[in-house]
Amino acid sequence: FARKSGCYNLTLNVWSCNPSAIKFYESCGLRPQKVHLEALLSADGPGAGSAEAAPMIRLARPDDLPALGPVYGVARRFMAEHGNPTQWSDRYPLPEDLEADLQRGELYVFDQDGVIHGAFVLRLGEEPSYRSIEGAWRSGAPYGTIHRVAGDGTVHGLFAACMDFCKRRMSHLRIDTHENNAVMRHLIARHGFL
């Protein structure tokens, strides 16, 4: 957001997609400026020099695995509190699941100043569980599959960042969720999945 007043140009960096926050800043005379994710994540982008950098998406490393247990714990509790207590079991994903994702180079994390705030899996190529489905896929083109999206609840916009990241790597994406996961179903639909 930026507001020009006399000789001064005030710039306030706000990393929010919250409509209420945006309306508040607009009511103060500030105007929104759309910034692409690449610019936010680059070293010299709009957030450079700010006190808090935007979360960076990167491949997970072995030393990230201990931080993922609590992240997935928050996600399991969130799902249970929002009408979906059965999609992920008490300990899902298991540490060995995450280790296998890491070894295949499919596990990504949201890293903000060395703190892991979320994770997801992007699997490029055929997904065995999609070989037999009810209905039909709209395209038989090569695709990537998104699995195990989770955040710790402290950073907003992780799902949108995940989608942008995945779309830059594969033009055809597939994702699924449990029928009781209303929050994820809403997010998936909002990002153009049918």
Residue spans for each PLM region:
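C-terminal "cap" of GNAT-fold acetyltransferases
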Residues: S5-M56, Y143
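A short beta-loop-alpha structural element at the N-terminal edge
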Residues: M56-P70
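Conserved beta-strand in the GNAT
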Residues: V109, V115-G125
